C-alpha cells in the first residue's frame, strides 16, 4: 500500500516469493501451518510426522495437506497485497518474479494462479526464472543454452495465459568480470529470435555501487 501511494504504476515483488527451496529448509511447518495441515487431514499431526510424510515415499495424504497449506498461504498473501493496492488504485499493476517452485507444484500453487491473484483486475505480468548468471556458477549444472530453453519452456506453459511475460536478464553479482555482458546479450538475442516472450528485464546496475561504476552492460545493450 505504501509503495502504491508513492505513485508507482507497476509493482513487482522480486525473487523468492516462495516457501519451498529455501536455504533454511523445505517450506514451512510453523504452528499455524501445522494447525492447518491437521485441519485438512482431520487429525492432529506433529512435525516429525509431517517431515516423514513430505520427504518419504510416494504421494500421500500428509504431503498433499502440506502442499495445500503452502499454496493457501501464498495465495492468501498475494490477495492481501492486491487488496492493499486496490485501496489506492485498482489500475496499478502488481505481480511477482516466478521461482523454480512456482512451476514445480511443490508450493501447492503455481505461477499462473499467483500472477492472477496479484493482478486482480489490473493487467497481469510475469517474469520467468532462469538468468545468464546461472551459467557463470553452473547452477544446477545449467549451461546458457539450458537456461534459454528453461525460459522457453515457461513461455510454453503460460502461452495461453494472456499475461505480459518477460525474461530474467540478471547478471548477478555484477560487474562484467563476474558475468560478461556477452552472456546477457546472447540470452536476450536467443529469446528475441525465439519470440515466445514479450521482452526482458535487464538487471544491469550494481545493487550498491554508484550507477557510474559499471556502464558496460548498458553500453552493450
Residue ranges and their predicted role:
Residues 1-149:
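Polysaccharide-binding and catalytic clefts of secreted carbohydrate-active enzymes
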Residues 14, 89-221:
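Hydrophobic targeting/anchoring helices
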Amino acid at each position: 500500500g505504501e509503495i502504491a501511494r508513492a505513485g508507482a504504476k507497476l509493482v513487482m515483488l522480486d525473487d523468492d516469493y516462495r516457501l519451498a527451496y529455501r536455504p533454511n529448509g523445505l517450506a514451512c511447518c510453523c504452528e499455524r501451518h501445522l494447525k492447518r495441515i491437521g485441519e485438512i487431514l482431520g487429525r492432529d499431526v506433529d512435525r516429525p510426522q509431517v517431515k516423514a510424510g513430505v520427504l518419504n515415499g510416494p504421494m500421500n495424504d500428509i504431503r498433499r495437506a502440506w502442499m495445500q497449506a503452502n499454496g493457501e498461504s501464498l495465495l492468501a498473501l498475494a490477495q492481501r497485497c492486491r487488496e492493499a493496492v486496490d485501496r489506492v488504485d485498482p489500475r496499478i499493476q502488481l505481480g511477482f518474479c516466478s521461482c523454480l517452485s512456482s512451476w514445480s507444484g511443490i508450493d501447492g500453487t503455481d505461477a499462473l494462479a499467483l500472477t492472477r491473484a496479484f493482478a486482480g483486475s489490473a493487467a497481469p505480468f510475469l517474469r520467468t526464472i532462469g538468468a545468464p548468471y546461472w551459467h557463470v556458477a553452473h547452477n544446477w549444472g545449467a549451461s546458457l543454452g539450458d537456461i534459454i530453453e528453461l525460459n522457453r519452456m515457461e513461455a510454453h506453459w503460460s502461452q495461453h495465459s494472456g499475461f505480459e511475460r518477460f525474461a530474467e536478464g540478471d547478471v548477478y553479482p555484477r560487474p562484467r568480470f563476474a558475468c560478461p555482458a556477452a552472456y546477457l546479450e546472447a540470452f536476450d538475442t536467443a529469446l528475441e529470435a525465439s519470440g515466445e516472450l514479450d521482452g526482458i528485464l535487464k538487471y544491469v546496475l550494481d545493487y550498491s555501487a554508484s550507477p557510474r561504476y559499471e556502464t558496460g552492460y548498458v553500453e552493450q545493450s
